[in-house]
């Protein structure tokens, strides 16, 4: 670049270049027929490099440089895409007083295929209906473990690159792992949680501590709201109904009792008591519990810090191992927790082994004595509200997680790509409420969850590399993003095709929101056949259909299809980027370009073919005409 001497604005320097080198149409012609910029920009263009030998560079760099183009191609090459294509390389010029620039734009199309046809471990049994509830809860259990388990990044690799498949050079370990997760049959127990694993693996030391803490908080809350389900006190519920006196006199096991607030820092005791990792055995012990209640617990925990459940959820989800003293020092316990919430959260964060980068906001002033008296009266009423304590616990945990997410770096903070699971749990909750959990919806739920996790992981990767890298986004802009999903049968024929489009710099994050909502809503249509006329409009509203998002008939075909026919799903990610074209100020490069353009124009006028790049063609002579003006401060050149 130092030798190239890049120039962006050529407003008062146009006469230094050949006419074809300064206009969008001229650069398009040069890029396509002379230099082949779509490939040349990927070469080493240092003076004298092998790529610059002979026609048309003659040991000089190219007269233009497409800023960001090489990084775009490298970003796509570093991922697990099976195919990559770059088309519609175009140039546009912007001319206004004092400003004349040229931009390049390209459409990238990258795709890969995932094997979704293997459901044997999940749902293929001789008597499926007899084991439906067990299968459903087993699937939920494995998924919840993937959501809440304290996942650690990969360790133990002495090198970060390993030998790939036949014919490949060494590839990053992360790429091999992502390729491994493309097959639902092969990855088996590791089918779930791919997006979370990759998020942890890409985190820095500070982010790793924060993400692990957030995961512990969600795990603790999930264990808290399910503790009443596995509580030993539940074993004697039948006896309590028959003999209330015996129930009141029977003490609860001491190891399951924890009084709150035991001190001001109740959060530490809460996390210490409940943050044991969620494992399959714990979830399987809940099989006697209605699936609908289990799903409510899952949604409440996974959706943290967003989406406070309705009040009736707290009546159904009660922590069973906390003994709540109704009053402490004349004040309601729940109100005490609410008053001290900010202080407890700040102390918890300050104890973490990370340096905080956000200035602490001073706490609000204490309430006057008159207000305290009024609040005490309100507390007595508030304590009677069923579920108030559970609601306060969730509110505190949610606020703590929200503050921890603000401490994350920008790359680790973008959690919108990892919230897709909530849509699928809510779809399962609706099916459970309707009593419509059968083989077909469960098959579709598994397949679409697996596909959505792949889409979320890929969109997050593209977002981090193309939209969240400041050096790149300072120059290159994302204009359009599109995801195409093609379901194929065992012989490769397309069963249905779906398209989602979004525009702007936030296109990737908007896409995952639309896709997860769309596919989760389609789960409920599994096994119902074709939609009736009166159902189509409602279904389109549920999936938030937008114009230019694919054929409506394809959407209806997807809803009605039998998912056992689908063997694989091809995912195509298309995105259009626009970046700047830099011009050279080096006189030697300009002279070579002037000679090459004049010679190519002469050959074209004579209807002759242009030489291929690297052809052994002597350097053409300088075309006749007036000497181009010198750049400011340049010395006159003597010709011999």
Swiss-Prot record:
Q: How is the protein modified post-translationally, according to the record?
A: Preterminal protein is used to replicate viral genome, upon genomic encapsidation it is processed first into iTP and finally into TP by adenovirus protease.
Site location (Cleavage): 157-158, 320-321
**Major localization class:** host cell
Q: How does it assemble?
A: Heterodimer with the polymerase; this heterodimer binds to bp 9 to 18 of the genome. Interacts with host POU2F1; POU2F1 binds to the auxiliary sequences in the inverted terminal repeats and tethers the pTP-POL heterodimer to the origin DNA thereby participating in the assembly of the pre-initiation complex (POL-TP-DBP-NFIA-POU2F1).
Q: Where's the motif Nuclear localization signal?
A: 351-360
Modified residues annotated as O-(5'-phospho-DNA)-serine in this record: 549
Similarity field: Belongs to the adenoviridae terminal protein family.
Name of the molecule in the record: Preterminal protein
Compositional bias of kind Pro residues = 620-634
Q: What biological function has been recorded for the protein in this entry? A: Protein covalently bound to the viral DNA that acts as a primer for viral genomic replication by DNA strand displacement. Assembles on the viral origin of replication in an initiation complex with viral polymerase, DBP, host NFIA and host POU2F1/OCT1. The terminal protein stimulates the template activity over 20 fold compared to protein-free templates. Neo-synthesized viral genomes are linked to two preterminal proteins, one for each 5' end.
